[in-house]
Regions:
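Cofactor-binding beta-sheet edge motifs in enzyme active sites
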Residues: 1-141
């Protein structure tokens, strides 16, 4: 459980011969107990999932001669709206006590992405971001 909530995430993708990765869709299900504002839960999961996907595809802190190369978010790559795949969120009905939602979408996207990549390509990566291994995102679903 993440913050008292249970979450599952699946990535549907295809890998091209040149290591281009087309992410077709992201599907998450969350059981966060009693939901009083489903729109907020959807927004938190969608945003957290895309934030985590950006980190999994591109982001790392790099050092050169002992100095961090990223000074702020202007050189820390994030997905743009036109690059983002569809995100499907399913809220599991529950009468349990409410759990956390804020960061739950972010935590699972990396492992889900690596599992989908392994299933599609046969290559099992153990480090993120994917760009380190030569993979790059391709637009379009």
């Amino acid at each position: 459980a993440v913050f008292g909530s249970f979450v599952a995430t699946v990535v549907e993708l295809e890998v091209q011969a040149d290591k281009g990765v087309r992410i077709k869709r992201l599907v998450s299900a969350i059981d966060c107990g009693l939901v009083t504002n489903p729109t907020s839960v959807l927004a938190q999961i969608e945003g957290g999932t895309l934030f985590g996907l950006s980190a999994s595809l591109f982001n790392e802190i790099t050092l050169e001669q002992g100095q961090v190369q990223q000074s702020n978010f202007h050189n820390y790559r994030q997905l743009r709206i036109n690059e983002a795949p569809g995100v499907e969120v399913h809220i599991v009905p529950s009468s349990e006590d409410p759990g956390g939602v804020g960061e739950t979408g972010t935590a699972l996207i990396g492992p889900a992405l690596l599992n989908a990549l392994a299933a599609a390509s046969g290559e099992r990566l153990r480090r993120l971001p994917l760009s380190r291994a030569g993979y790059f995102p391709v637009k379009g679903a």
